[in-house]
Structures are given as C-alpha cells and as structure tokens.
Amino acid sequence: MTDILIDNTATETVRTLIRAFPLVPVSQPPEQGSYLLAEHDTVSLRLVGEKSSVIVDFASGAAQYRRTKGGGELIAKAVNHTAHPTVWDATAGLGRDSFVLASLGLAVTAFEQHPAVACLLSDGIRRALLNPETQNTAAHINLHFGNAAEQMPALVQTQGKPDIVYLDPMYPERRKSAAVKKEMTYFHRLVGEAQDEAALLHTARQTAKKRVVVKRPRLGEHLAGQDPAYQYTGKSTRFDVYLPYGTDKG
C-alpha cells in the first residue's frame, strides 16, 4: 500500500476523498520511495529527495492544451468520435486520455486499479468539476476504482457493452520533455510495470461492441504480440485497432 501524509491544511473534502481508497496514513514522509501528500485542496504524488510533485490538473499546462485541441488529435480518429461512441478506458492512469475523450463529448468510464493513482485521478476530476472551464468535460467521466479486466464483465451485465474499449499500457517514454520524463519516473516507481497485456486485450475484445483501441509508441511492438486490424500512426504515437471477437469491421 501507498503512504499518505495528511497535512494540517488538508480540507475536509480532501480528507473524505482519501478515505475512499486503501492508503496508509503516516505522520511523516517515508525514508525512501514515493508517497502521497494531502495539503490544502489537493492530493499530490511525491518522491523522497525530490522537490517537484505530480498532481492531476486538467485546467492548465499540457492537459489544457490537449483538452482545447483534442478534436484534431489522432485519438479522436482512432475512436471514430464523430459516431459519438461510449468509451471504457481500461487503463486510466492519470486520466489524460480519458479527459481528451470526454472533451470530445464522449461518455467515458475510466478504470484505475492502483489506489494511489485512482486517488490522484479522483482528486483531479473533483477539482475539474469545480472549474467552469473544465466542469462540463469532467462530468462526462465516471471513475471506477479496481481492475478493469475483473470489473468490465460485471459492468456489462448492468450497463451493456461499450462501443470502444481504450487501452494505454505503460511503456518507456522516449524523446519526451524533461518534465514528462520526471513525471513518468515518479509514476513508474509508484505502480511498477507489470501488466498482463494478453489477458487485458482478451477481455477488451470480449467487451467492446465496435473496436478496441490501443495506444503505442510509433515504432513500438504490438500489444501482446498480436497484430491489429488497422492502425492510425502519428509522429510519435500509434493507435492500433483490434476488432471484437466474431466481427469483421470496426
């Protein structure tokens, strides 16, 4: 489990949010590694010995740019956003792609299984709902804490299948800015890199009605060594499209 240091300045709203996740409250930072810090109205990820931190903030920086420019992104084409599909993001992480998809007006169900990451994302969505510039987009995201491969089959029984299942398995970041590299260092140290890619892709293809979209590096290997039906390729990123089992078009 991840430690969380709750500062005296932490609001009651933040304290309530934290209690929804299996985190370990501590009175001081650990001697090494990463931990969460709750202070004022924000939860952040810290790495012992580093001054910088990671928070989920959809109203500024790169997230703001992607939110306002999202309609022209390759991801929009990959999910065929003009058809207004429902999207289940099975690997939400810090929620950037979920937010871009939601900014397109799509209904996004986001799954995140790591409690610390889910806490960071939940906090980011909460603050986005309070900001006039981001509240409409944030309202399109429904966050589920848990393993997507385990939760999706049960959710299908109550909500039906989504049009799209979106996957963004972690992979090494190359040719990125120093800020992005540092953030990914924090993230990888927190959650590790072990993922059962084959099982995740299998469940996604069982779940989606129209297509499974997988984000990869432009020159990266196919997920679980499985060839996609077709691809959308950009300068640094590629989206591989897999069809649901038993279908011949997406």
Curated annotation (Swiss-Prot):
InterPro entries: 16SrRNA_methylTrfase_J, SAM-dependent_MTases_sf. Disulfide bonds: none annotated. Gene3D superfamilies: Vaccinia Virus protein VP39 (3.40.50.150), YhiQ-like domain (3.40.1630.10). It holds the Pfam family SAM_MT. It is found in: Cytoplasm. It catalyses: guanosine(1516) in 16S rRNA + S-adenosyl-L-methionine = N(2)-methylguanosine(1516) in 16S rRNA + S-adenosyl-L-homocysteine + H(+). The keyword Ubl conjugation does not apply. Its EC number is 2.1.1.242. Coiled coil: none annotated. Keywords: Cytoplasm, Methyltransferase, rRNA processing, S-adenosyl-L-methionine, Transferase. GO terms for cellular component: cytoplasm. GO terms for molecular function: 16S rRNA (guanine(1516)-N(2))-methyltransferase activity. It comes from the Bacteria. It is an enzyme of class 2 (transferase). The keyword Transport does not apply. S-adenosyl-L-methionine binds at R96, D97, D168. One of its GO terms (biological process) is rRNA base methylation. Its main location: cytoplasm. Specifically methylates the guanosine in position 1516 of 16S rRNA. Belongs to the methyltransferase superfamily. RsmJ family. This is Ribosomal RNA small subunit methyltransferase J. It comes from Neisseria meningitidis serogroup B (strain ATCC BAA-335 / MC58). The gene is rsmJ.
